[in-house]
Amino acid sequence: MACARALNSQTDMTETEAREEICRVGRSLFERGYVHATAGNISVRLDDGFLITPTDACLGFLDPARLARLGTQGNQTGGDRASKTIALHTRIYAAARKFDAGTACVIHTHSTHCVALTLNAPGDELLPALTPYFVMKVGHVPLVPYHRPGAPEAAELVAQTIERHGAAGTPIRAVMLERLGPNVWHESPAAAMAVLEELEETAKLHLLTGPAKIEPLSNEQIDELRRTFGARW
């Protein structure tokens, strides 16, 4: 189901189609175990505002008509009460679009393996360059220190992190909130979901190796991925 549709730009969608796509992606993530209970949220940027999943909603059972609708300034204009993370989402859009103008979807989950890695003080980034597809499809995933869910300080740190990496010439598509979960973004819900899946599966792979020392890809191997596939690492 994850690859059932092409990863079309969100600008090709009407609001009705965007509502349906949020629900389709949420259901897919839930049914395949990438989200659980009422953890996680999905938003889409529209020309005149945003759609976001309601607070405490299960992503597997979303109703397109009940998604929260917000104006360009984040004021709610319709639907059920918006997720408390809307401020974080809007900061991500503002920062990420400086380097990826097509950014139109943000997904946040409490992905088990990603969160597990944050419990062992991994450093400034969640994962090293373990596999070629992690480098190509995800890229650097900076770790943001723990803040309570919805804390404005976390949103500020995330925005600063996105802008710092972008200014350095390595734009990112994901950050990891310590003990909470990843935020990923791309030009459509399907494309953002693909980033999330690759991130969580790489975290799982890392944990499966146990305490063994893992050698990441070499600088030469990463350079080859940059030259061949345009990897942003």
What are the language-model segments listed below?
Residues 11-233:
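Glycine-rich flexible loops
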